[in-house]
């Protein structure tokens, strides 16, 4: 699934012309460059900087900690669950 398709599912406009093929979902610690992950709380914030996930659903407050691509979400866990239905 393309990153642009994930933005469409979330009802958001993609902020840049950056495109990535997301082939799966995984945890912050295990995700690779073509996988989507999420961070939904302070307990997981420590893993944001070291995560290799290609894109991470994250609240605005922690977006600057994502090294690859941050997708801003008011409820990262719920959005991740909704997107998982397409994988």
Which role does the model predict for each range below?
Residues 1-87:
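Terminal amphipathic alpha-helical/low-complexity segments used for targeting or macromolecular assembly
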